[in-house]
A protein has these predicted regions:
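Active-site hotspot residues in diverse enzymes, especially metal/ion-binding acidic/histidine motifs
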Residues: 1-224
């Protein structure tokens, strides 16, 4: 059985889920996706916060399977704790206001693991969302896990759930008269367009970097040869 879906397939599934969510909760899909509400009221998953004590500080989110323990700080000790199945556990530091973008994306990533396990009719298993740290040395096994197909799929679906095309197009209309953002060469964006992206990101509730990646993925970055 294949355990791979293309970007187009992931986009289509995400669009279908968001459409079903919007039909059920018509006041929830306006300028951004209330990902916490989507998770708890539509997917019917729980969200909890804990102080992670894993060796890998990049592990900031976890989808519990009811069997795999998560190392957490509790009462001055580090203990293995098993959370109930279908619980998304986030590191407590993500509650800070400045971490809103990372918090929302981590929720979407873990929710995507749940959705994908249902699509593949596979039993759910405990999965971490780990952020890549360019200053850290990773083992081959850690790198393989981080960039595994299932993680790419969860990242791709998470971005699609959090930033549906319709939401981005609405923000682009509001802040850039529906014009695509121009990129010169491979990565150069003017200060003016960077400011537009920052306003769009704040409006949607995501990070600048996540939005740039999403704009590129859905072909709303226009490549120009020179300024």
């Amino acid at each position: 059985m294949s355990i791979y879906m293309s970007r187009a397939e992931l986009e289509e599934i995400s669009e279908g889920l968001i459409t079903a969510y919007a039909n059920k909760f018509s006041n929830r899909v306006i300028q951004s996706i209330d990902i916490e509400h989507f998770i708890t009221e539509f997917l019917m998953l729980r969200i909890e916060y804990a102080s992670f004590a894993e060796d890998d500080a990049g592990r900031i989110g976890f989808l519990a399977d009811g069997a795999t323990p998560l190392l957490v700080h509790q009462d001055g000790k580090i203990i293995p704790f098993v959370f109930p199945k279908d619980t998304i556990v986030l590191d407590k530091f993500l509650l800070a206001e400045k971490e809103q973008g990372r918090r929302r994306f981590t929720m979407a990533h873990e929710a995507s693991h749940h959705i994908l396990s249902k699509m593949y009719a596979m039993p759910s298993e405990g999965r971490f969302h780990a952020e890549y740290d360019s200053e850290r040395s990773y083992s081959k096994e850690e790198l393989a896990q981080m960039f595994a197909s299932v993680e790419w799929q969860a990242d791709t679906m998470g971005a699609s759930l959090l930033m549906p095309r319709r939401i981005i197009e609405n923000a682009l209309a509001k802040y850039n008269q529906s014009n695509p953002i121009r990129v010169y060469g491979d990565n150069t964006i003017t200060s003016k367009d960077k400011a537009v992206i920052r306003r769009m990101a704040a409006y949607i509730g995501v990070s600048y970097t996540a939005l740039v990646i999403r704009l590129r993925d859905i072909c709303l970055l226009y490549t120009s040869p020179s300024p």
